[in-house]
Regions:
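Helix-loop-strand module that forms the ligand-binding subsite of alpha/beta enzymes
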Residues: 34-128
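Residue-level preference for long, well-ordered alpha-helices that form the structural scaffold
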Residues: 10, 75-78, 82, 142-145, ...
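Short gly/ser/thr-rich secondary-structure transition/capping motifs
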Residues: 27-35
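Glycine-rich phosphate/pyrophosphate-binding loop and the adjoining helix
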Residues: 128-168
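Short, well-ordered alpha-helices that flank and scaffold nucleotide-derived cofactor binding pockets
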Residues: 19-23, 27, 91, 120, ...
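N-terminal beta1-alpha1 ligand-phosphate binding loop
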Residues: 1-26
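A structural signal for isolated positions on well-ordered beta-strands in alpha/beta enzyme cores
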Residues: 2-4, 30, 101
Length: 168
């Protein structure tokens, strides 16, 4: 199954989860940032999985993402702001007809959901949900990921691939 796992990541946590999901889906899955997820890459995919961090209790806006530059002094490393926000990427996504899923990285107690917003936008573009939105936890605002989350992400990818291939 050809799959693209698209991510917005600022401190590497969401990117790591995306790579684990792609590994779980199988050898024809690729993880790529919103900057690299071109319309050509998306058109070739049977499954699109998209994920972003929870910002401001939802999917971050472009101005919220740009505001992360002010976090550089507090964070262990500067945020990666080199790629478009997931919201911007989704706004540029053309109509599709394949399967899709969504995930988010977040602190456990935060209300709201980026993943539900992502999946809703994918559905509005014509994609059919392949799984319920998934949450992966970080230990603090900048990470790292909680123990076991990479393994859980890989398992989630494998479960989706199995379900979509019709295997019992």
């Amino acid at each position: 199954m050809k799959a693209v796992v698209v991510y917005e990541s600022h401190w590497g946590n969401t990117a790591a989860i995306a790579r684990a999901i792609a590994e779980g889906i199988g050898p024809e899955a690729r993880a790529m940032s919103t900057a690299d997820a071109t319309s050509e890459a998306i058109a070739e995919a049977d499954l699109i999985v998209a994920g972003a961090p929870l910002l401001g209790f939802s999917l971050g806006t472009e101005s919220m993402v740009k505001g992360l530059a002010g976090e550089a002094a507090k964070a262990p490393s500067p945020p990666d702001l080199s790629h478009p926000s997931m919201r911007s990427w989704l706004e540029g996504l053309g109509k599709g007809s394949g399967r899709a899923a969504a995930f988010e990285t977040r602190i456990w107690w935060s209300p709201g959901s980026a993943a539900k917003t992502i999946l809703g936008k994918l559905q509005a573009a014509g994609y059919t949900p392949a799984a319920k939105p998934e949450r992966f936890m970080v230990k603090g605002r900048y990470g790292p990921l909680k123990d076991g989350e990479l393994e859980r992400a890989k398992a989630w990818g494998a479960e989706m691939a199995k379900a979509l291939s019709g295997q019992p």
